[in-house]
Amino acid sequence: MIDFLDKRKPFFIRIFLKFFISRKSIVSKQTSLQNLYKIFVVSLLIISFFYLLPASYKFVRKVIQPNLEIENSSSQKLTQVLEGKLLDENVLNDENYNSTDQDLVYQELYGEVTEEDNLESGVRLKASVLYQLFKDTNYSLKDVRVNKIAKPVEIGKLPYELKEIQNVKKRKELFIQIVLPLILEENNKILLDRKKLFAILNKNNNSKSDNEWLNKKFKQYGISKRDIPTLKRRMDIIPPSMAIAQAAKETGWGTSRFALEGNALFGQWTFSDKGIKPAAADAGTTHKVMMFNVLKSSVRAYTRNLNTHKSYRKMRYVRAIQRDNQGKLNSIELVDHLDNYAETGKEYTEVLKKIIKQNFLSDFDDVKILPSSEAVKNLI
């Protein structure tokens, strides 16, 4: 018989065997202590395996696969749709692809813009007509600054006469009156999605429709693996003051060729044939400026760009911190992280801050837009 007090065995094993045999009296003198020793070692290994496996998995996830924002591959799809192309074969053969992907990309750019909308809002009104329209509807920026309420006026195209208005103050006011409602309306849609997101996250159990909605939003914001923290950072508004400042800078307060001919408010590039070639482009450059059917499409593409592109990741992190600290967004701080938007870098961000301050654009950051007659009708 093997001596269980053999000093060659580990001390704690000898103590365990001695205690187990003496206290329980379930092993007779004829029982092979060698087998008992093997059983104990195997049991210890099994217990260690199931204890260490979860800890090892968490370590690998934390160290080897940190929670990074996934680069937005949907921006490439967006450009393809804008160019009128079908999604490429690699996307179509992807097992995660379904037939609604192309419709989703198009829908996310143009939203609820239908052919009927294009016919109505796509008409270019003269500046004199717009002045009268705003007067008849009591829509003035002075009232907006005081009452913090904007009228749901949707203008599809900028008037050609903008560049002919000699009074700089009047030209700027007309431009803001046109652009502000479009920005507020797009932000409203994002806020509704954000409200729904947090409502779903506060539920104990999600319904099938909740999960379908989440999957749609993950795809819309270019996120894989159901990364909720990234979705919360990306699904947020663009401060109106920042958006107006960028639109003003990119279009010369609505007087540029890109804005008047292509309804492009934010100078986003495309490398397709369907775009406007910059007159001052360097030799050998192939980029063009995106064209849109109506202004609201340009606004939607702009918010999508800032909320998904990796170049503005730092801006989204700072925005999330502002949300956590006080809830209100500070456009002056956020603008500092738009240096990748233009080739001039930090010089570009300083110009934006100057535009915001000189024109008191922060007054519009807490403005609400009245619901349109169509929205009211849907509530009845």
Can you say where each PLM-predicted feature lies in the sequence?
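Catalytic cores of secreted/periplasmic lytic hydrolases that degrade extracellular macromolecules
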Residues: 2-245, 249-380
